[in-house]
């Protein structure tokens, strides 16, 4: 096994170390088997995306995801607490504060090349995780594409320009993803959040609860696993360019769940909640997250709808004052019909 590392980091800073692997899994976009928004079985129109047939994959797909382990043996998965159940297929939350350092011990358990490329934090060319003709060579290229079975250590720092700005709340969200054929990699599932706080450690002391939501139309036609999914879940597909087949593999999800199947969105009245929003995708990924029954503060402005473009990142705050179960969804009409809907529940104190 090849183990490589990028340049050394300061001994004076607090270093946050994460053991993260890229793993292949089977993912169910609707594990309850029904539309939780309506409380009924999927309709004919909804079954376009979730029903299995001789020539349709359905709601379960082979994907690649980032998963956190307890140490560099990568033998034991680190348990994900109930407060992060809602992350779905997103990778683990990477946290740090301004002035801290981040160390990612990354193992590629896939059969294809992968990397870890961060947004927002400071990295040198030997820790960028992105292959392109940038004029570098030698050690500066080792981070770009990690071979199957190999391990690489990425080291990033968090200067002031990576943390919250003057109009931001006390913590903000960035993201990380594989940049080896980035569209195919992110459609396959290789993406996760980075949370940076003004305070060292990456935790914000002025909030009670945090949620991360990715809004994206995952194009399962453009992943590493289309042929493998066809082989495993269908009896064969004659024409993968067929419009109906193509449409059936466009999964309009939030954290990899459709039609209200996103779990774990539970909080208590009176709590201060911070929402970290991530947009990703292509030209159809123009999203408008909307919360029912509550409002949020974004850069000092109050609203209940935001706009998300592909690769955009937004952090908003909500003070809970309205008990009940509330819709949280993209307000684009086509995305509503295709299942980009979830719910959050506000319990009594």
Label the model's feature ranges.
Residues 7-349:
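Copper-binding active sites and cupredoxin-like electron-transfer domains
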